[in-house]
A protein has these predicted regions:
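Short alpha-helical donor nucleotide-sugar binding micro-motif in glycosyltransferases
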Residues: 103, 222, 230-235
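Conserved donor-binding/catalytic core segment of Leloir-type glycosyltransferases
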Residues: 158-174, 180-184, 192
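Aromatic "clamp/platform" in nucleotide-sugar-dependent glycosyltransferases that forms part
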Residues: 243
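Short hydrophobic beta-strand element within catalytic cores of glycosyltransferases
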Residues: 260-263
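Conserved acidic donor-binding segment of nucleotide-sugar-dependent glycosyltransferases
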Residues: 273-286, 293-300
Length: 332
């Protein structure tokens, strides 16, 4: 069974969750017996589309004309488009209609969580929707002997420093304003954010906020995945204050690296992550501040082994098995 993984503007999306998900798909397919990546669309049995630009629509229509099965990957929802870039809220309704049109071109739809599936169904998408995690490469995301040392040396942190990290685009939805406010609230801890956005694309309040000059706050920008792995290994807490996700690949990476994880209590985590079992959650800045202090001071239970079990359930091996079943179902 040959699979053609299609996406547009790869250089634009490669630093995003979508870009990482595409890498995971290719990795999983190449490691799973009975599947292989097609080098061109003509050789494929299945066309797996990951983007929602006009070229993706054209690809889906071409595939239909040539008897190929189409899998549309629903990485985006109307809900997670809101509170992102300038004007996103004003056009969110139109965006929702557009992705509805795109996704319905698929013989089947794949989305990374039960929560995302419910959102798609709420907006009237009736095609077969399969839930499949974006997956995590456990062979790569594991601690290497010098990762912690290299991270701390690069950013000038001592072994005594308590370092809280997060990752994502510079957009309101990701909770970046909350992250900056927390750095002001807890000056005794070091805060570092990985990832960025073009400043022309984000609202004025975000542009102003990321220029904050705080002695305990650093914006590292986009870094290669090796350096991100070192950051996971070298920090004391992964705090993800996002307000909306379809899954959260960075959460899987943090769980795989066996570091404490603190998440906002939002619906996407229901059914697979639970407060006090494999992660900790918060509902307000006051709540988060208390949890951060408790975790950094070792005053509450270490849940990292339980968190790693969640990552294992979403390993590349499992992703490959799930993809194969989805493709086979589409070909029936």
């Amino acid at each position: 069974m040959k699979i053609y993984i299609y996406s547009e503007y790869q250089k634009w999306i490669e630093h995003s969750g979508v870009g990482r998900a595409i890498y995971h798909q290719k990795n999983a397919i190449s490691k799973t017996k009975g599947m292989e990546l097609a080098e061109c669309k003509e050789d494929a049995d299945v066309i797996h589309i990951n983007t929602i630009f006009p070229g993706s629509v054209a690809m889906a229509r071409w595939a239909k004309r040539h008897g190929k099965k189409v899998i549309f990957h629903a990485h985006s929802t109307e809900e997670d488009f809101r509170n992102s870039f300038i004007g996103s809220n004003a056009i969110a309704g139109l965006f929702g209609k557009w992705i509805h049109f795109c996704y319905q071109l698929g013989d089947a739809i794949v989305t990374p969580s039960e929560y995302a599936k419910k959102l798609l169904q709420k907006h009237g998408i009736s095609e077969s929707i399969y839930v499949m995690s974006n997956g995590i490469d456990l062979d790569y995301y594991r601690r290497q002997s010098n990762d912690r040392k290299n991270f701390r040396a690069k950013y000038g942190y001592s072994e005594k420093d308590k370092v809280i990290m997060s990752a994502g685009l510079w957009i309101r939805r990701k909770g970046i304003l909350d992250f900056i406010e927390m750095a002001k609230r807890l000056p005794e801890y070091q805060f570092i954010w990985f990832g960025d956005s073009n400043l022309w694309s984000v609202p004025k309040e975000i542009r102003k906020a990321v220029r904050s000059q705080l002695p305990n706050l650093r914006f590292a920008g986009y870094v290669p995945k090796k350096e991100l792995r070192q950051a996971y290994a070298g920090c004391d807490l992964f705090w993800f204050p996002t307000y909306e996700e379809t899954e959260g690949i960075v959460v899987l990476e943090a769980l795989a690296m066996k570091i404490p994880v603190l998440l906002r209590d939002i619906p996407v985590y229901q059914g697979w992550l639970a407060d006090g079992q494999n992660v900790y959650t918060f509902q307000s800045q006051e709540d988060a501040s208390s949890r951060i202090t408790d975790i950094c001071n070792g005053e509450i239970a270490d849940l990292t082994d339980n968190g790693y079990q969640v990552a294992m359930e979403r390993s590349m091996n499992q992703t490959g098995i799930h993809l194969q079943k989805i493709y086979q179902s589409a070909l029936l």
